[in-house]
Amino acid sequence: MTQTNSYQVGGDHYALKTVQPWDAMEAWMGEEAFAGYLHGNCIKYLARYMDKNGIEDLMKCQHYLAKLIEVESKKEAMAESILQFQAGREAAICGLTRDTRRSKDWLEGYDQVKAEDDRHDD
């Protein structure tokens, strides 16, 4: 359970569910659309707090913002993991290339020595 799923502002009608609606939305909507949904709710609650529910709306805005930060942090962590994987793969390829080059150099040297030995045997 993520930190933002461990509580709810303004009741517990979502927190009591096995799957919270925003988790289902995240799974179905895709990253960009879900981030937009969270961003939109931040704007909604911030815009209406003076006219409707005051502090509670500010707390809801804060809750949606915390969820948006979780989502964006997860994206950044995933991007960093991908970069690390790619860097590791590139290093491995460079290592294989270097080892292949060494093997090729060794074989060429061996072939030269063998050719000289063969000439001396004639």
What do these predicted regions represent?
Residues M1-D122:
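Intrinsically disordered, low-complexity regulatory regions
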